[in-house]
Amino acid sequence: MKSFLISVLGDDKPGLVDGLSEIIVSNNGDWIESNMSSFEGKFAGILKVNVPSSDAAKLTKDLNSASLGLQIACEETLPVDKHSNVRSYNIELIGQNHVGIINKLSHVLADELQANVEELKTEIID
């Protein structure tokens, strides 16, 4: 069994997820996890797929030749060693928006705390 991370980006339209899932299932793949969104008329997503080793090459070929109108990148992943002594934090920051706010926050997290950002969601609320 092989695992792949697949990223997609393109103009949003009906049928994109259906098209991706059809390619995956036709190659005996299992859609494990995903995060997909539509922003400003664009569709972006990342998903994890498991596929039998014997079908891996055909899956990547089919994804690369798909006529879905998406930019698709497919990369094989290896098992990740999760350290049990790593601490997780959930940070919620509410404040006035200004240029560089994410840069300042990420600098503190990376350089001062050696923290890894695993998920980031931002929005401006009027």
Which residues are covered by each model-predicted region?
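A conserved regulatory-domain signal marking ACT and ACT-like small-molecule sensing domains
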Residues: 1-126
